UniProtKB/Swiss-Prot annotation:
Coiled-coil annotated residue ranges, if any: none
Cellular component annotations (GO), alphabetically ordered: cytoplasm
Cofactors that this protein relies on: Mg(2+)
Disulphide-bonded residues: none
The protein's name in its UniProt record: Holo-[acyl-carrier-protein] synthase
Catalysed reaction, written as an equation: apo-[ACP] + CoA = holo-[ACP] + adenosine 3',5'-bisphosphate + H(+)
Pfam families on file: ACPS
Length: 123
């Protein structure tokens, strides 16, 4: 059963501007430690796709970034096959547990000017 869905479209220019203003602080504020370690240098599209995934996940949880849920509580990682996946930590994990989330589906894409993500939470 579908418990939540979320969609986000992020402008690459917005992420580029944030990186130019705060090249160290911005990624540290939104990325989980494992994502920081995997972040390609100066990859706006990579970062924008993760930003979109986190926004979409927060929407699917129904919380947005309130109630203690933070960007760093939502981790995007890749399976060995290269498939992108989501993992919840902290308040996001607790909320997903309360909802009865058993499976998380994530789809990412990016083009010249935008990155997008869709998240489906299944129970």
């Amino acid at each position: 059963m579908i418990l939540g869905t979320g969609l986000d479209l992020t402008e690459l220019g917005r992420i580029r501007a944030a990186l130019e203003r705060q090249p160290e602080r911005f990624p540290r504020r939104i990325l989980h430690d494992s994502e920081l370690a995997a972040m390609p240098r100066l990859s706006v599209a990579w970062l924008a796709a993760r930003f979109a995934a986190k926004e979409a996940a927060a929407k699917a949880l129904g919380t947005g970034f309130t109630g203690g849920v933070a960007f760093r509580d939502i981790e995007v990682y890749k399976e060995l096959s290269g498939k992108p996946c989501l993992r919840f930590h902290g308040a996001a994990f607790e909320h997903a547990q309360k909802m009865g989330v058993k499976k998380i589906h994530l789809s990412l894409t990016h083009g010249r000017d935008t990155a997008a993500a869709v998240v489906i939470l299944e129970g």
